[in-house]
Amino acid sequence: AKMNVQGSKRMEALSKELDFSYKRNGSLVLCFEDADRSKLEELLEKAEKNGVEGCQIISGDEVRQMEPQVSDQVVAALYAPAGGIVCPFGLTIALAENACANGVEFFLNQEVQNIVKKDGYYEVCTQDHVYETKLVVNAAGVYADVFHNMVSEQKIQIIPRKGEYWIKK
C-alpha cells in the first residue's frame, strides 16, 4: 500500500516524461448498506495510516452528485481524490521503450523452464539458453506462483479470480 501511494505521487510526472495517458480522477469505494459503514471507516483508517491524502467518507447523495449514474441504493462511499487511471497498454509500451533506450535486452519467445538461485545471481533456464542475472522480475501475473516456487522454499498458490473494471467517459 505504501508503494502504491509513492507510485501514485510519481505517476503524473512519469506520464509526461514517457508520454502515456494518465488521469487523476479519484476513486470511490461504494457502500450499499448502513451496516457496512464500519468497513468504510476501517478502509479510511488504513488509507490514512498508509499516507493516502485527502480520503473522506461521503454520503450517498454526495456520491450521486459526483457520479449521477451511481445506484440510489448507495448509502455512502470512501472517496480518494488521489486515485488515477492509466492506459495499461500505453504504459507498458512506454516502459518497454524506455527500458530498451536504457540498454535492456529483450529475449522474446523464450519459455522459462526453471530458475536456479545461485550465490549472488540466478540462472534462468529456457528451452534455448541459460541466462545469468543478478535480478529476476516476476511479472507472470496469475502464473507468478510457478516462478516464485522455483526459487523459494515457501510455496504459494495463486487462485485466479475474475473481476471487472468499468470505464466511464
Name what the model sees in each region:
Residues 78-135, 139, 143-146:
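Helical element adjacent to the flavin cofactor pocket in flavoenzyme catalytic cores
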Residues 24, 74, 120, 127, ...:
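A generic structural signal for well-ordered coil/turn residues at beta-strand boundaries
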Residues 27-31, 77-79, 165:
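Short aromatic/hydrophobic contact patches that present stacked aromatics
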Residues 129-169:
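Central helical "cap/lid" subdomain
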Residues 1-66:
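Dinucleotide-binding Rossmann-like beta1-alpha1 core, especially the glycine-rich loop
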Residues 35-38, 66-74, 116-123, 131:
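A short, glycine/Asx- and small/polar-enriched loop/turn
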Residues 4-8, 99, 141-144, 163:
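Short amphipathic alpha-helical/adjacent loop interface patches that line ligand
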